[in-house]
Amino acid sequence: MLDAQTIATVKATIPLLVETGPKLTAHFYDRMFTHNPELKEIFNMSNQRNGDQREALFNAIAAYASNIENLPALLPAVEKIAQKHTSFQIKPEQYNIVGTHLLATLDEMFNPGQEVLDAWGKAYGVLANVFIHREAEIYHENASKDGGWEGTRPFRIVAKTPRSALITSFEFEPVDGGTVAEYRPGQYLGVWLKPEGFAHQEIRQYSLTRKPDGKGYRIAVKREDGGQVSNWLHHHASVGDVVHLAAPAGDFFMNVAADTPVSLISAGVGQTPMLAMLDTLAKGQHTAQVNWFHAAENGDVHAFADEVSELGRTLPRFTAHTWYREPTEADRAQRLFDSEGLMDVSKLEAAISDPAMQFYLCGPVGFMQFAAKQLVSLGVNNENIHYECFGPHKVL
């Protein structure tokens, strides 16, 4: 536990942190990658270039300083980060490296004096130990599962299927022919790649898209403009290629009773974790209402429509509604969508009126903010809304 003086000293630096903003974490990352370039093999350098990771780390540091007297308030954030860390296979010794550069950054940017540096050193040590302990538990849990493993495990691509103009699914089976660990619907898979021509190893997390079957895994990847990994997977990865995978992880998942109503709300590739949830509900003989609300630009980029329809037909109480923002003439002729424009859940208020309903959201942050605001305005309890951000976490 931290003493009162240490807590007071750390909290006194909050105004300075807020004034500096993400410049603090930009300096930190630049320093760390200069002194420890081997960490470029772990960090998503795309998120470094666009500033997302710097903003996320700054928000985490500021939140820790603000809640240093109430660490339980940080546990949800700790769980989210710890789960992601296990996908990157973060080790305890790497926390020492981060701590060294964090303190050096504070010293170089602010010259706050040894008392402040010592206080932050103690505070960081407490937080690092929380992460190290939780991550050790997750590693042990993953390795102890039937079909589980430590580190990464080689898998072979056994199917590659275009699902839309932008989304392709990939199916993996283990090279060793063994079983694979189960996961919760909504969790993701860590994909480790370093093909020829890549400057660094690249690690990405992709949502699993179906109910666990013990034999293999399926993900779906959107081809992003300028996305190094997504473009390689779309244009160069082939059936028979071997990739290394970290065990499934993630704090966003569905865990509901058969009589709990569920709404799965997504936009674009945000439907991928929802597919695993829908598959689980369908194969688990879910008896309560299930809603599938999806938004896409048009039919060219709308993936998995047939699969969703097939799964929906197996559920006794299923409502699906699709919004196309800019439908094509072919979309109109084939009646591939239900509504034009942005998603408006108020039109389907009767389908979401049950106060016990659980809502799962995934898609661009702006979309999730838009959808969550609508739900709250219709009387949905915030505690019933669960969401996943692809990339560094943001608060809706």
From Swiss-Prot:
| Cofactor(s) needed by this chain | heme b; FAD
Q: Which InterPro entries match?
A: Cbr1-like_FAD-bd_dom, FAD-bd_FR_type, FNR_nucleotide-bd, Globin, Globin-like_sf, Globin/Proto, Hmp, OxRdtase_FAD/NAD-bd
Which residues make up the binding site for heme b?
85
Site note Involved in heme-bound ligand stabilization and O-O bond activation applies to: 29
What EC number is given for this enzyme? 1.14.12.17
Where does the chain bind FAD?
188, 204-207, 389-392
**What are the FAD-binding FR-type domain coordinates in residue numbering?**
150-255
What does the record's cofactor remark say about binding?
Answer: Binds 1 heme b (iron(II)-protoporphyrin IX) group per subunit. Binds 1 FAD per subunit.
GO function terms (MF aspect): FAD binding; heme binding; metal ion binding; nitric oxide dioxygenase NAD(P)H activity; oxygen binding; oxygen carrier activity
Keywords, A to Z, come to: Detoxification, FAD, Flavoprotein, Heme, Iron, Metal-binding, NAD, NADP, Oxidoreductase, Oxygen transport, Transport
Tell me the active site: 95, 135
- Name the site position(s) for Influences the redox potential of the prosthetic heme and FAD groups: 84, 388
* BP term (GO), one: response to toxic substance
Record keyword Protease present: no
In this protein, which residues make up the domain named Globin?
A: 1-136
Instruction: Report the function annotation for this chain.
Output: Is involved in NO detoxification in an aerobic process, termed nitric oxide dioxygenase (NOD) reaction that utilizes O(2) and NAD(P)H to convert NO to nitrate, which protects the bacterium from various noxious nitrogen compounds. Therefore, plays a central role in the inducible response to nitrosative stress.
Q: What is known of its domains?
A: Consists of two distinct domains; an N-terminal heme-containing oxygen-binding domain and a C-terminal reductase domain with binding sites for FAD and NAD(P)H.
**What's the protein here called?**
Flavohemoprotein
Native source species: Salmonella choleraesuis (strain SC-B67)
Question: Which gene carries the instructions for this protein?
Answer: hmp
